[in-house]
Design a protein with these regions (language model features):
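Terminal, non-globular segments
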Residues: 1-167
């Protein structure tokens, strides 16, 4: 859990660094969200809901987004994936990726609808779609790095979770 928080804080820090002085014409991936999804679908006990909410609320505050809105939507998306995780455990990576893609698109649409209802200025739809697609393209890489570097693999029957109980 501490590693997840450290990685998220490092990603937030890298996002806040002023590496470019001109605004970009494209939207990069949300690596923190891809990391959260990858770890959630492999070891849900490593990313409890309150930890996800706290990390994304901090990101909302630091990135000057509407406080708590994206954090709440991420939490809802994570809970939807958490409910499907036992069924996805034995299926292929393509099914997992499709499930993540569906969740990401629904989250993005929900975020945009709520911002529109509240009459808040938002990024063009093209940039939002570009970010979702970029996040989906980086997701396999995040999943591979999570397994190869950090040892976060899918739960097998009989594994012991972080709380000491068998799965």
């Amino acid at each position: 859990r501490l590693l997840y928080v450290a990685l998220c804080l490092a990603l937030i820090f890298l996002h806040l660094l002023p590496l470019e002085t001109l605004p970009r014409g494209w939207a990069g991936p949300d690596v923190m969200l891809a990391l959260t999804f990858a770890w959630l679908l492999r070891r849900p006990d490593y990313v409890p809901p309150l930890l996800i909410a706290a990390v994304f609320l901090l990101a909302d505050l630091l990135f000057q987004r509407p406080p708590g809105l994206w954090a709440a939507i991420v939490l809802l998306g994570n809970q939807a994936l958490r409910a499907r995780e036992p069924g996805l455990r034995d299926l292929t990576f393509a099914v997992e990726w499709l499930s993540v893609a569906t969740t990401l698109f629904v989250m993005m649409l929900g975020y945009r609808v709520i911002l529109a209802l509240m009459m808040v200025d938002q990024a063009p739809l093209g940039l939002s779609l570009m970010q979702v697609i970029a996040t989906l393209l980086v997701y396999p890489l995040v999943a591979i790095v999570s397994k190869a570097v950090f040892g976060v693999r899918k739960i097998a029957p009989g594994d012991i979770d972080a709380l000491g109980s068998r799965t």
